[in-house]
Regions:
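C-terminal catalytic/motor cores of large multi-domain enzyme assemblies
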Residues: 1-292
């Protein structure tokens, strides 16, 4: 998205939508909390096209393998780029268009009970492709697990946790007030995925079947995507015969205030089309796609 001159009422990360219809103006006032306005979309995706695609991408034995997560994340952020209302949010009872497209997720340093987690936030460019996103995820994961990268958001939480409880509670209340007005500095929220366009979690990687995650009133994220566990499902083939194919359930939790049902339905159709045709993700993400 092109840089615009900042005006009174704009945030550092978003532009205030001034010319809006009465419904969207009123909704932020009478329904001020994001977590009270969740809508849930459940979709089952056939993984066979994605399996063929990542097998081709991994054919030459690259060290950091392409996975379903890379394809799903890239398809989702391309959907957000092509369907810009998905990149909106309400904050402090106002309606905003985010200036950038970002994707947030949590990295588990080790698959062990006592293992720490770190937060990652990717900035997605219009010219990005699945290859560039794959490499950025590789860098984030490697830096996190090798503990070479200082995450200012994680560090800020550690500082607050080290304070006496009454001081940390007072500090957090002040930070929440800053958050409400869009004044939180980057050293506090720079890598917080709750400020992303898309917050995505691969629960299937830890063998959880859950397809729902709540939105939060902290931050600005209006779209949460859960990737479930892969499973074999009986599906009809092109000849009308039933065969077992691998599928995954995706759960999308969205803020119903930012767009209407028709807009969401059309966006989901685009998202699923991209997952059925993953080679399209090798093109710049801003490139339009004929899907209807």
């Amino acid at each position: 998205m092109a840089e615009q001159k900042r005006r009174w009422g704009d945030r550092r990360d978003a532009t205030l939508l001034r010319d809006v219809d009465s419904l969207h103006f009123i909704m932020g006032i009478i329904y001020p909390n994001r977590a009270d306005n969740e809508a849930y979309i459940a979709e089952r995706v056939n993984l066979e096209p994605i399996k063929d695609y990542i097998a081709t991408k991994n054919y030459e034995g690259i060290p950091f393998k392409y996975t379903f997560f890379h394809v799903i994340l890239t398809a989702l952020v391309k959907t957000v780029i092509l369907r810009p209302k998905l990149n909106r949010f309400y904050a402090n009872e106002n309606y905003y268009q985010r200036n950038k497209v970002t994707a947030g997720f949590v990295i588990k340093k080790e698959f062990a009970d006592g293992s720490e987690e770190a937060m990652a936030l990717l900035e997605i460019k219009p010219e990005s492709t699945i290859e560039t996103i794959h490499e950025e995820i590789h860098q984030e994961v490697a830096a996190c697990r090798e503990q070479k990268k200082v995450n200012t958001t994680d560090n800020s939480m550690n500082v607050l946790n080290s304070l006496p409880r009454f001081l940390s509670k007072a500090a957090v209340r002040f930070i929440r007030w800053l958050d409400k007005h869009g004044w939180c500095p980057d050293f506090l929220i720079g890598k917080d995925p709750n400020y992303s366009s898309v917050f995505i979690s691969n629960l299937g990687s830890i063998h959880l079947k859950s397809r729902y995650h709540h939105l939060t009133n902290w931050g600005t994220s209006s779209l949460f995507c859960i990737i479930g566990e892969k499973k074999w499902t009986p599906l009809y083939d092109e000849h009308g015969l039933v065969e077992m194919q691998e599928t995954v359930d995706l759960g999308l939790t969205v803020d119903e205030r930012i767009a209407d049902g028709y807009y969401y339905a059309k966006s989901v159709r685009l998202f699923k089309y991209l997952l059925e045709h993953p080679t399209l993700l090798e093109r710049p993400l801003s490139e339009e796609v004929e899907y209807e």
